[in-house]
Design a protein with these regions (language model features):
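Short, highly charged C-terminal tails/helix-capping segments
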Residues: 93-117
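Aromatic/basic-lined ligand-recognition segments
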Residues: 108-209
Length: 209
């Protein structure tokens, strides 16, 4: 399901600092609105992430999590976050089996990520069958997607090779998260707020019904 990497360190860094470092080196990163006292920060790449990633402060350092049905943009952000944050806090990186990871980009190279994405897609199809075709709910960055037989048939991916089908599915999931339900507008009723680090309120991106 989810993949967790632990950054073992006694040092800490402010949320704003590590997000600015990630954004400055990698790509435009948008952080979901969280309370300053909240130990978990959830964020993704604007218009690209499907599920985003989570960084949680723990007693031993930091936990960096990526969830099932993440896409390539999520995985790329996850790898860069682990690399950048581990340098900022001088951390050693370990997987869930307490095995040390020397190079996250080597440990989770593009080929392995492709395998995980295809595996997740196949797993969702198995879960749908186990639920007799009834939709399964998976949360994206902003809203829940309901995935069932009707959707798979609607996307016309039933008979496609798994990798191709997974790519089409993730594009649909991306459209659901961003194109349809995210609008740039002031004075709206919002359930969740995103803002680019350093941007003013006028650049915020709002989710609303």
């Amino acid at each position: 399901m989810s993949i967790v990497v632990n950054l073992i360190t006694s040092k800490r860094v402010e949320r704003k600092t590590f997000l600015e470092n990630i954004q400055g080196i990698y790509a435009p990163v948008y952080c979901l609105g969280v309370d300053e006292d909240c130990p978990t920060t959830r964020f993704g790449v604007f218009m690209r992430s499907n599920r985003g990633i989570e960084v949680t402060e723990i007693d031993e350092g930091y936990e960096v999590r990526i969830n099932v049905m993440a896409n390539k943009a999520d995985f790329d952000l996850w790898r860069h976050t682990i690399q950048i944050l581990s340098v900022l806090v001088d951390a050693e990186v370990y997987n869930e089996d307490d095995e040390k990871i020397e190079d996250i980009f080597q440990e989770y190279d593009d080929a392995r990520i492709d395998e995980i994405i295809v595996h997740d897609y196949k797993m969702i199809n198995v879960m749908i069958k186990c639920h007799h075709g009834k939709p399964i709910g998976i949360f994206g960055l902003f809203r829940e997607a309901h995935i069932g037989n009707w959707l798979i048939e609607h996307l016309d991916i039933t008979d496609l090779p798994a990798k191709h089908a997974a790519n089409i599915f993730h594009q649909w999931f991306n459209d659901l998260n961003w194109d349809t339900y995210i609008k740039e507008k002031e004075g709206t009723s919002t359930q969740m707020m995103l803002r680019e680090p350093g941007s003013d309120v006028s650049k915020r991106v709002s989710l609303y019904h």
